[in-house]
From Swiss-Prot:
Protein name stated in the entry: UDP-N-acetylmuramate--L-alanine ligase
Keyword annotations of the record: ATP-binding, Cell cycle, Cell division, Cell shape, Cell wall biogenesis/degradation, Cytoplasm, Ligase, Nucleotide-binding, Peptidoglycan synthesis
E.C. number(s) listed in UniProt: 6.3.2.8
HAMAP family hit by this protein: MurC
GO CC term, one of those recorded: cytoplasm
Physiological role: Cell wall formation.
Family note: Belongs to the MurCDEF family.
Database matches in SUPFAM superfamilies: MurCD N-terminal domain, MurD-like peptide ligases, catalytic domain, MurD-like peptide ligases, peptide-binding domain
Organism: Thermosynechococcus vestitus (strain NIES-2133 / IAM M-273 / BP-1)
Residues engaged in binding ATP: G118, T119, H120, G121, K122, T123, T124
Length: 475
């Protein structure tokens, strides 16, 4: 059994977005925390400032020479392989070993928890809910899968019993959670490394729903509408219909955001304005409204909080503008996410804006996902004017030798007239140096390391701008 007392917590892979959030919460609660990762990053540096002992590198020595007593309970994610030397040392030393989902489940059990699940939209929706509870004075503890400026990170410790958490389905650990409120944004086939079929995915979400006291779910998703059941189910939709609890009409999507009138069971609540773009974010906002109204928060407070919300890091995050080119970083790595992101971007391109062309750069994530969803990946870039595909980011998967980024590009050429395949990040940088022009909105898409290229591409454009200015002065 997990102990929340004198026994320390040691996280193998503490620099990950999910692991670091849990480590932060435990450290802020006054528990002794340590962890290791292969290299330092911004998250490990923040944890070190809290007094968390950080080991760089993963080796048996981290536990064999552990600085605290007693030996820790060791926390791993699904990314940690069974042959990891630190994991093997934990087994040899008899350390209690838990999955990161066990820590989150234990924290939920001690709280009035709101868990946000879904194939897409988890981070934005959970961040929106957390921001609403903050603005409503409910002082929640927050654990999300992205960094949010409002609480300067991916986690926050509040003083109330409320906990807002993002609940990951990728490895099936969603089945461990028993939240007070379970939010399900959508259900689609993903993570084929874990799930063999859509039916398995639906079954996992159904068990999560069964274990929640109340479920709030999107009726626009066929797999929710037709397959999900719960005796206390609140639904929301972008379509005005009597069968749902929350819906909208008079929707206006613009380059600045979205406006809509919100309905609650046939009664108009008022007008909602959002600064985040696209239909998918309006859906996310409806989930937030349903949660807020269930908690007794008035619509004016909800609408004000949603208007102020500016998004999470790597969710259509603007990285800057150089030489008349706008750079966007987005985590989208599933076809539905990519399509939603590009459709939102399309709202900002045209005669009424400075932006005239969308250039999408996509790094496929995992061989298993790419192979399973190949046709959908080929079809989801129609809202872009030009697309560049890199080779696949493995995320630790072995290369099966049956799928590559070139296959994605070949598939995309059946549906798109302007496609490049640049296998390496260096090749992408070279191609963009010749391709980009003032008026471009370039979006870097994927869950791998593609976004690390953005500063270099921006620096190239800075250099081009300086060179052009120098030539103009010389003339």
């Amino acid at each position: 059994m997990m102990e929340f007392n004198e026994r320390p917590f040691h996280f193998i892979g503490i620099g990950g977005i999910g692991m670091s959030a849990l480590a932060y919460i435990l450290a802020k609660k006054g528990l002794r925390v340590s962890g290791s990762d292969l290299r330092p990053n911004r998250l490990t540096e923040q944890l070190a400032e809290l007094g968390v002992q950080i080991f760089i590198g993963q080796s048996a020595a981290n536990l064999e020479r552990y600085p605290f007593t007693p030996l820790p309970q060791v926390i791993c994610s699904s990314a940690i392989r069974s042959d990891n030397p630190e994991y093997l040392a934990a087994q040899h030393l008899g350390c209690p070993i838990f999955h990161r989902s066990d820590v989150l489940a234990a924290l939920m059990h001690r709280s009035q928890s709101i868990a946000v699940a879904g194939t897409h939209g988890k981070t934005t929706t959970s961040s929106m809910i957390a921001y609403l509870l903050l603005q409503a004075g409910l002082d929640p503890t927050i654990i999300v899968g992205g960094e949010v400026a409002a609480w300067q990170g991916n986690a926050r410790v509040g003083q109330s019993r409320y906990l807002v958490a993002e609940a990951d389905e990728s490895d099936g650990s969603l089945r461990k959670f028993h939240p007070h409120i379970g939010v399900i944004t959508n259900i689609e086939l993903d993570h084929p490394d874990h799930y063999n079929s859509l039916e398995e995915v639906v079954a996992t979400f159904q068990q999560f729903a069964d274990q929640a006291e109340i479920v709030i779910a999107c009726a626009d998703c066929p797999n929710i509408r037709d397959r999900l059941h719960h005796p206390r189910l609140l639904t929301y939709s972008l379509q005005r219909q009597a069968a749902v609890d929350y819906c909208v009409d008079h929707i206006q999507y613009t380059a600045e955001g979205t406006t809509a009138r919100v309905w609650e069971r046939g009664t108009s609540l008022g007008i909602l304005q959002l600064n985040v773009l696209g239909a998918h974010n309006l859906q996310n906002a409806l989930a937030v409204i349903a949660v807020g109204r269930y908690l007794g928060i008035d619509f004016a407070t909800i609408a004000a909080a949603l208007l102020e919300f500016r998004g999470a890091r790597r969710r259509f995050e603007e990285r800057g503008q150089v030489n008349g080119i706008r750079f966007i970083d987005d985590y989208a790595h599933h076809p539905s996410e990519i399509m939603a992101t590009l459709e939102a971007a399309r709202l900002q391109v045209g005669t009424q804006t400075p932006w005239q062309r969308i250039v999408a750069v996509f790094q496929p994530h995992r061989y298993s996902r790419t192979q399973t969803l190949l046709k959908a990946f080929g079809q989801c870039f129609t809202a872009a004017d030009h697309v560049i595909f890199t080779d696949i980011y493995s995320a630790g998967e072995p290369d099966p030798g049956t799928i590559s980024g070139a296959d994605v590009a070949t598939c995309a050429r059946q549906y798109h007239a302007s496609v490049d395949y640049c296998p390496t990040l260096e090749a992408v940088q070279t191609r963009l140096a010749h391709l980009l022009q003032p008026g471009d909105l370039v979006i870097f898409l994927g869950a791998g390391n593609l976004n690390q290229l953005i500063p270099s591409v921006m620096a190239d454009q800075e250099q081009f701008s300086v060179s052009s200015l120098t030539e103009a002065i010389a003339l």
